[in-house]
Amino acid sequence: MTVPKKRTSMSKKRIRKNIWKRKGYWAALKALSLAKSISTGHSKSFFVQQTSNKAAE
């Protein structure tokens, strides 16, 4: 089993953690943007099946 030879410095650990957090931030931002475009009906890349309310009445 491989073991790291030296301890990772605090600054390197902080940099890696911030990169990991930034990836999550951008993923959440894209998901929110897609949800907004779907809810307003302006989505060009996502197709949603429209349901009619007349059948229920």
UniProtKB/Swiss-Prot annotation:
GO terms for molecular function: structural constituent of ribosome. The keyword Ribosomal protein applies. GO terms for cellular component: chloroplast; large ribosomal subunit. Its main location: plastid. GO terms for biological process: translation. Transmembrane segments: none annotated. It is found in: Plastid, Chloroplast. It comes from the Eukaryota. The keyword Transmembrane does not apply. Signal peptide: none annotated. Keywords: Chloroplast, Plastid, Ribonucleoprotein, Ribosomal protein. PANTHER family: 50S RIBOSOMAL PROTEIN L32, CHLOROPLASTIC, LARGE RIBOSOMAL SUBUNIT PROTEIN BL32C. Belongs to the bacterial ribosomal protein bL32 family. This is Large ribosomal subunit protein bL32c.
